[in-house]
Amino acid sequence: MALSISMNAQAQTTNSRFAAKESLSLTNEWDKTFPKSEKVMHEKVTFVNRFGITLAADLYRPKTVNGKLPALAVSGPFGAVKEQSSGLYAQRLAEEGFLTVAFDPSFTGESGGSPRYSSSMDINTEDFCAAVDYLSCRKDVDSERIGIIGICGWGGIALNAAALDPRIKVTVAVTLYNMTRVTQQGYFDSMDEEGRYQLKKQLSEQRTEEFRKGEILPQGGLPDVPTDDATEFLKQYIAYYKSEKRGYHSRSLNSNMGWNITSTLMMLNQNLWIAASEVRTPVLIVHGEKAHSRYFGEEAYQKLTSGKYADNKRLLIVPSATHCDLYDGGEGNFIPWNEIVDFVKRSIK
């Protein structure tokens, strides 16, 4: 009996340790969809989340600023990689004096995790918290001045992380989606309960078939060219993710074969923003006036300001901007850099 107790104690001690880092294959060349800034230093870094998945990130640090810096973790859009929009935001904020990391979420890009091209709101929220772990323990970071920026679906995930983790002192959610709402209700809330049931049935049957064959299948991704009846926002996605001159990247699942077919199943029973009214720290919601997703930003702002912590929340609508214009600026340079930088600096001064 004593031996059994001793063995159990040893097992508990062993299991409580962080997982060893996965061996990742990281590129060394500059393979971003945006030009390299001469104002910042860049390096690849890795860190492990609480699910044992090793995340790969690009770290940007201003060349002319020393000492402990305020820091930001950046991710998104949903299905993108750090070489796309999140890297652009991270590099631009580093030019403003922040140490930043743009990371690939679990199961995607250069990060670890298997099966590939899977999503989980729990694990992805943990990805943000793991980035805060990493930043908090860097000697060149002021651990009391850490924030996060989420783009598209990762804007919604950022709100969930902010509600969970008081170490996050400021949050910026750009052109955000509520991934659980759009999964459960469809675009513009077009799906009813029967539609949800049929989707659950379809995805559950897909799971059975995949288990039988031992293979998890991708959705197929965006078409290279939109059909005549494609929605305007689908055309905008294609124009960004499929264009070599704009946002295409070989490791981006949005640019290629897309998410796993069953990846969204668990979102059908989740409420990502259930604690949004409890976010005490400042939040800036940035959305385009003409974005198909604007209603998600307005929903987020309503939830954030429905409780007693409303005073430090702001909704910024960018005139004439669409959803994807805020990925890279679009043709009108729509990203409101000055407003974002000012909000973050004032919030964590």
Locate predicted features.
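Alpha/beta-hydrolase active-site loop
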Residues: S118-K139
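Catalytic histidine-centered segment of alpha/beta-hydrolase-like enzymes
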Residues: A321-N333
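Short beta-strand/loop motif that positions the catalytic acidic residue
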Residues: V279, I285-H287
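N-terminal cap/lid segment of alpha/beta-hydrolase-fold proteins
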Residues: A20-G67
